[in-house]
Swiss-Prot record:
Function text: Catalyzes the reversible conversion of aspartate and 2-oxoglutarate to glutamate and oxaloacetate. Does not have prephenate aminotransferase activity.
Modified-residue entries (N6-(pyridoxal phosphate)lysine), positions: K247
Any Gene Ontology biological process: biosynthetic process
Family, per entry: Belongs to the class-I pyridoxal-phosphate-dependent aminotransferase family.
Protein name, as recorded: Aspartate aminotransferase
Summary of subunit composition and partner proteins: Homodimer.
EC numbers, comma separated: 2.6.1.1
Stored CDD domains: AAT_like
Alphabetical keyword list: Aminotransferase, Cytoplasm, Pyridoxal phosphate, Transferase
Gene3D superfamilies according to UniProt: Aspartate Aminotransferase, domain 1, Type I PLP-dependent aspartate aminotransferase-like (Major domain)
Chain's gene name: aspC1
Binding of L-aspartate, residues: G45, W134, N184, R382
């Protein structure tokens, strides 16, 4: 429908109508629907730990349900005790010292990202987005009036962008750099030296930086997590940190995230949230309080399992002709290149892109994967290894069998 269409005839606004469905959630929903219909589908689509939330966190929520004070409205920006605990947890885990007044508690990381961009972007402001990227980032930027500018890295650099690439993408309209380490979808982890170089470049150019630290505790081997505002402290006044309990504590369904930033930005984002959703569910906030106040024993156990699965999935994927899978250093995703398989005949079909290849894998092997188009880089597939060991081996074995049939 054209922009000239009378307002009374436009059923959906152009702004919201332009938003794409979350590709990762769509793949996960399709896999679950097929399973419900009786097909033995194995899903590698969802970025979700397969572990239950630790019991001490659940018990805190159960107790909160019975406490009348949590049956009422609470401050829109979050329970004061949770904000203080998040500040303490941030200092403990990353060395970044912040005040509770710099914290906004949100309904998960997605709301945190949108509200952060909404608080600092004006129409036309550009945000440099290293690709491959998580599907939600560009949509949040556009909703906030900004313009995402992709900077693509591939497997030859371990999916890490360089300062030279970032500088080439910078214009007079550039306001923000999005920085994510460990990365979804690639599992890339930047070294301290790389973070320092990128951070100092951003500081010299006067840019804001939004850094997503949701996978801070999921790093493997010799890789280490480093918080950008700790490595480059002069960025603190123009740095926004997004985090949450979902990945570290297996709490994806509880929907608790947060934004840490300069007080004026947090105040603006809190005002926005006061009109959008008000406070996050009090029961979920109390559960998050128990999570961030506790130790990291549970995540250590999960990390050990993820590390084992990481090694298995990389080995098995690299056994497939035409597949190249770098070893991820963080998060829980493998991001193999399958460019060499595109256009080849597989069971009577010739997939021309990874959307078609992913559809073929789902139909023929009954395995759900996410095509690279969802992350801004066609020619790749994302597979989450946050699923049981047996399912992981069975699922990749099915993919091996199917793709071994590829021929010119």
């Amino acid at each position: 429908m054209s922009a000239a269409t009378p307002p009374t005839e436009r059923r959906v606004s152009a702004r919201v109508g332009a938003i794409s469905e979350s590709a990762t959630l769509a793949v996960d929903a399709k896999a679950k629907a097929l399973k419900a219909a009786g097909r033995p589908v194995i899903g590698f689509g969802a970025g979700e730990p397969d572990f239950p939330t630790p019991d001490y966190i659940v018990q805190a929520a159960i107790e909160a349900c019975s406490n009348p004070k949590y049956h009422r409205y609470t401050p829109a920006g979050g329970l004061p005790e949770l904000k203080a605990a998040i500040a303490a947890k941030t200092l403990r885990d990353s060395g970044y010292e912040v005040d509770a007044s710099q914290v906004l508690v949100t309904n998960g990381g997605k709301q945190a990202i949108y509200e952060a961009f909404a608080a600092i972007l004006d129409p036309g402001d550009e945000v440099i987005v290293p690709a491959p990227y998580w599907t939600t980032y560009p949509e949040s930027i556009r909703l906030a009036g900004g313009v995402p500018v992709d900077v693509v890295a591939d497997e030859t650099t371990g999916y890490r962008v360089s300062v030279e690439q970032l500088e080439a993408a910078r214009t007079e309209n550039t306001k923000v750099l999005l920085f994510v380490s460990p990365s979804n979808p690639t599992g890339a982890v930047y070294t301290r030296e790389q973070i320092e170089e990128i951070g100092r470049w951003a500081a010299e150019k006067g840019l804001w930086v939004l850094t997503d630290e949701i996978y801070e505790h999921l790093v493997y081997g010799d890789a280490e997590f480093h918080s950008l505002p700790v490595v480059v402290p002069e960025l603190a006044d123009k740095c926004i940190v997004v985090n949450g309990v979902a990945k570290t504590y297996a709490m994806t369904g509880w929907r608790v995230g947060w934004v840490i930033g300069p007080k004026d930005v947090i105040k603006a984002a809190t005002n926005l949230q006061s009109h959008a959703t008000s406070n996050v569910s009090n029961v979920a906030q109390v559960a998050a309080l128990a999570a961030v106040s506790g130790d990291l024993t549970a995540v250590a156990e999960m990390r050990e399992a993820f590390d084992r699965r990481r090694k298995t999935i990389v080995r098995m994927l690299n056994e497939i002709g035409g597949v190249l899978c770098p070893e991820p250093e963080g998060a829980f995703y493998a991001y193999p290149s399958v460019k060499a398989l595109l256009g080849k005949e597989i069971r009577g079909k010739r997939p021309q892109d990874t959307v078609e290849l992913a559809a073929l894998i789902l139909e023929e092997a009954e395995v759900a994967v996410v095509p690279g188009e969802a992350f801004g880089t066609p020619g790749y597939l994302r597979l989450s290894y946050a699923l049981g060991d047996e399912d992981l081996v069975e699922g990749v074995s099915r993919i091996q069998k199917l793709l071994s049939e590829a021929k010119d």
